UniProtKB/Swiss-Prot annotation:
Residues 1-22 form the signal peptide. Belongs to the cystatin family. Phytocystatin subfamily. The keyword Nucleus does not apply. GO terms for cellular component: extracellular region. The gene is CYT1. It is found in: Secreted. This is Cysteine proteinase inhibitor 1. It holds the Pfam family SQAPI. It comes from Actinidia chinensis var. chinensis.
Length: 116
């Protein structure tokens, strides 16, 4: 039999942990989370990198305009999935870019880039 003070402590800890977990938004491990501030310097930097890298790889001349929406996913670093408005000549279109970022290694890779 567990002593009464220890039982009360365990019950209190269980109730506290349930309250903490219940108050959080649940996102599956490795799931995509919406980016709250699309205008942050970090998001803008990743978006501009995506357009610049696409231009190098595809010999294109898109001009970055803005981030329309975006999501992050924690992996061995961070994946950014961004919908970017970019100008192709006089026409503005939306493009989806996925960028893998590991800032502590000064590593950034454009995983995909496509018109949406």
């Amino acid at each position: 039999m567990v002593p009464k003070p220890l039982s009360l402590l365990l019950l209190l800890l269980l109730a506290l942990s349930a309250a903490v977990v219940g108050g959080r938004k649940r996102v599956a491990a490795g799931g995509w989370r919406p980016i709250e501030n699309l205008n942050s310097a970090e998001v803008q930097d990743v978006a501009q990198f995506a357009v610049s890298e696409h231009n190098k790889q595809a010999n294109d001349e898109l001009q970055y305009q803005s981030v329309v929406r975006g999501y992050t996913q924690v992996v061995a670093g961070t994946n950014y999935r961004l919908v970017i408005a970019a100008k192709d000549g006089a026409v503005v279109g939306n493009y989806e870019a996925v960028v893998w970022d590991k800032p502590w290694m000064h590593f950034r890779n454009l995983t995909s880039f496509r018109k949406v």
